[in-house]
């Protein structure tokens, strides 16, 4: 679950560990862990699209959740995201979410 932590500028993700304890971590830390895991498992393979890969892993679920939250209202979603409505439409099309 994502939430905005009080008096901070980062998003927090609640996760559950093996002892069923709810752990809250900044989203940026989870991204770092995921990237570290990904990079450690490359086994010498070359990667040339990591930025696009990482961005799409965040952008697609973000757009999906915001569109659900706004019940498909693109104007409201664009305002929430701080982007132009035409940019939002372009991104929705990119992920076949239109």
UniProtKB/Swiss-Prot annotation:
Keywords: Activator, DNA-binding, Transcription, Transcription regulation. The keyword Thylakoid does not apply. Residues 74-93 bind DNA. The keyword DNA-binding applies. GO terms for molecular function: DNA-binding transcription factor activity; sequence-specific DNA binding. Pfam families: HTH_8. PANTHER family: DNA-BINDING PROTEIN FIS (PTHR47918:SF1). Homodimer. Belongs to the transcriptional regulatory Fis family. Activates ribosomal RNA transcription. Plays a direct role in upstream activation of rRNA promoters. This is DNA-binding protein Fis. The gene is fis.
């Amino acid at each position: 679950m994502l939430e905005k932590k009080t008096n901070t500028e980062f998003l927090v993700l609640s996760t559950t560990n093996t002892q069923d304890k709810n752990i809250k971590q900044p989203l940026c830390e989870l991204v770092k862990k995921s990237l570290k895991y990904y990079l450690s498992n490359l086994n010498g393979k070359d990667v040339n699209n990591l930025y696009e890969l990482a961005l799409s892993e965040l952008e697609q679920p973000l757009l999906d959740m915001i569109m659900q939250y706004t019940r498909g209202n693109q104007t409201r979603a664009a305002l929430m995201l701080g982007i132009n409505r035409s940019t939002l439409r372009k991104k929705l099309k990119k992920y076949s979410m239109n």
